[in-house]
Amino acid sequence: MSQVKRTPLYETHRALGAKMIPFGGWDMPVQYSGIIAEHNATREAAGLFDVSHMGEIFITGEPKIVLDFLELVTCNSVASLSDFQVQYNAILNENGGLVDDVTIYKFSAEKYMICSNASNYETVTAHLLKYLPASGVKVSDQSPNWHQIALQGPKANEIFSKFLGRELDSIKYYHFALLDYQGEEIIVSRTGYTGEDGFEIYSSIPFGLKLWSGLSEFGKPQGLLPCGLGARDTLRIEAKYPLYGHELNNQWTPIESGIGWIVKEKKNPYFSSGKILSQKKNGTEFKIVAFALTEAGVPRENFRVLDFQGNEIGKTTSGTFSPSLKKGIGLASIRTEKIKDGEPIQIEIREQPKQAIITTKPFIPGSIRKN
């Protein structure tokens, strides 16, 4: 059994009184002051998250060979990226399932970075190395060398720009910049996993510890709170964002996983592109959708989803009590013919069917500043 890993902020979390839990092979804070308080702080002001458990994999080499390689193993169009742009994408296996959902950072035609999930970055690295061309491309897992924190919320821009002493409006949504701060180069990316405006900040480990403590104190008067995985989960479900191991896995294609919007036709075929593009055109048997309960109850993972005749039509993949909406919400994989906005369904909670409706619209408006 492998040893549970700790992020560089582990002792800081303990000093703050965080409740720690295992997650993706890491010992991580699930909450500090409380999930609802942390959730509301992120929706109304700002939340600070330790995401140093995520992976950073660098792809470098000759421009055409690097691009062709990345286009082969992903379904979104890496070719469409400009320098200093970020893209949500999926690393595919040979059957069209997801090795991981990732963000790809383009520094230049010769250099990209893949940010991968904590439990998957070693698998992603091995998968990339398996299909590496004979020459012209280098894959380097540099995760142990990087520190990453996320500052999220409607006040994130105000707090971070004042903290740095510079404006950040020039960094557009899903773009990043290399900034010099106190003699250290940091990557500041306008991305996140909460449905709110904010930044994901990459740095060296020693400097990352300074950034966390500095931002924590600087943002406190504006309502900033340190936030754990509990709030991160309620926030992402409200934003209808998938989580690997729940809505995403190595069996379901991007279409079946509800992220079909990232599937593109490309100049050259990619892993299972024929199958995936056919699904995008013709549909699939099952698909991920969001739902909201219309009566009391809290849905969790792997609950049965029923139609109003009592027939099983799918299973929940994620569920929670929404602090923003004050009701149970979740995501589920259900039969495609049943997917219609406002369609009444039932979620079986403790063997009791609870009424719910399918929703195709966002649960919350959020504060993301789209370009």
UniProtKB/Swiss-Prot annotation:
It catalyses: N(6)-[(R)-S(8)-aminomethyldihydrolipoyl]-L-lysyl-[protein] + (6S)-5,6,7,8-tetrahydrofolate = N(6)-[(R)-dihydrolipoyl]-L-lysyl-[protein] + (6R)-5,10-methylene-5,6,7,8-tetrahydrofolate + NH4(+). One of its GO terms (cellular component) is cytosol. Keywords: Aminotransferase, Transferase. It comes from Leptospira borgpetersenii serovar Hardjo-bovis (strain L550). The glycine cleavage system is composed of four proteins: P, T, L and H. Pfam families: GCV_T, GCV_T_C. The glycine cleavage system catalyzes the degradation of glycine. The keyword Cell division does not apply. This is Aminomethyltransferase. GO terms for biological process: glycine decarboxylation via glycine cleavage system. One of its GO terms (molecular function) is aminomethyltransferase activity. Belongs to the GcvT family. The keyword Transferase applies. The gene is gcvT. Its EC number is 2.1.2.10. InterPro entries: GCS_T, GCS_T_bac, GCST_C, GCV_T_N, GcvT/YgfZ/DmdA, GcvT/YgfZ_C, TrmE/GcvT_dom1.
